Amino acid sequence: MKIDAVKKLLMIPGPTMVPPEVLNAMALPVIGHRTKDYSNLLEDTIEKLKKVFITENDTFLITGSGTAAMDMAISNIIKRGDKVLNIVTGNFGERFANIVKAYKGEAIRLDVEWGDMAEPEAVKEILDKYDDIKAVTVVHNETSTGARNPIKEIGEVVKDYDALYIVDTVSSLGGDYVNVDKFHIDICVTGSQKCLAAPPGLAAITVSEKAWEVIKKNDDKVGFYLDLLAYKKYYEEKKQTPYTPSVNLTYALNVALDLVLEEGIENRVKRHERLAKATRAGLEAMGIELFAKERARSVTVTSAKYPEGIEDSKFRGILSNKYNIVVAGGQKHLAGKIFRIGHMGICGEKEVLATLACVELALKELGFEVKESGVEVAKEVLLKE
């Protein structure tokens, strides 16, 4: 089968564009995963991950998507009937709740309007109401809505309780401020394919001493491939994974992490913030209403409402087929109502400006009267920032 892969500009909230040097790393020779060479590669990759997570906690690499890490976080800590407080501000917060239910736990939901963020005080109220909550889960950056949660402030609340604090940073690590140790995060998960700008297929997880105490006492664990104790044993004894890892994706992630650290976390976050401001300003200048509430807006993805009469499939079809630019649609009840532009990873000014220009052209082609040039307004923002 011949695969005709047309190179398109991925302006979706993952997977994101991958730098050439990262793609080239995947073409290195395959090595045995039970060799010293792979142990050295894995150890180096883990140490770089810890620098990006900003943690001294144990860190592990998983061959799987970010959902595998979410599953690992829940399956290793809960017993049947355990209560877990799930902060649900979008599709991925809901996924955490579904994982809890899959392992026969009791998902206590703090539901927040999609597009908004959770209030730390609301988390405190629920923790005060129940004295036996095993963990609190939250998604830092909800790509489904383009909104983010205040994980630092929520961490300040949760640290005063026995509950473990579990945070999904799949679409924020390497693009927004994450500090596992200072934010009191017990288990933090991420994926390779978003802000880190590596190909999809790897996930990472950090585990605190507080979390290990719970895991080691859990005699009702269900699972095999995602058993954290197995990962801990193999890494401590051999600097390996318990099961066959994706060797070539490890090469790729290692190089991607080099690029993150070379740019510097602070510089990288500021770049994401600039691009977010320019994207928002450009869309609003055209007359497009943003979806996420201003106080909660993500710096890695922007969500916007479709103007009346603009069909999702036609709009995104023009962008993809005519201009080779891919943006995302809405999920679940937001399908057909919003579109989402990812400006994460290695995305820069030219990608944002090109996307805004083509969004404007697509809207005009579909009969929408654009108020003013989004590109010009975005350029002004970029020049000021």
Swiss-Prot record:
GO terms for biological process: glycine biosynthetic process, by transamination of glyoxylate. It holds the Pfam family Aminotran_5. The keyword Transferase applies. Its EC number is 2.6.1.-. GO terms for molecular function: alanine-glyoxylate transaminase activity; L-serine-pyruvate transaminase activity. Gene3D superfamilies: Aspartate Aminotransferase, domain 1, Type I PLP-dependent aspartate aminotransferase-like (Major domain). Keywords: Aminotransferase, Pyridoxal phosphate, Transferase. It is an enzyme of class 2 (transferase). PANTHER family: ALANINE--GLYOXYLATE AMINOTRANSFERASE 1, AMINOTRANSFERASE CLASS V. Belongs to the class-V pyridoxal-phosphate-dependent aminotransferase family. This is Uncharacterized aminotransferase MJ0959. It comes from Methanocaldococcus jannaschii (strain ATCC 43067 / DSM 2661 / JAL-1 / JCM 10045 / NBRC 100440).
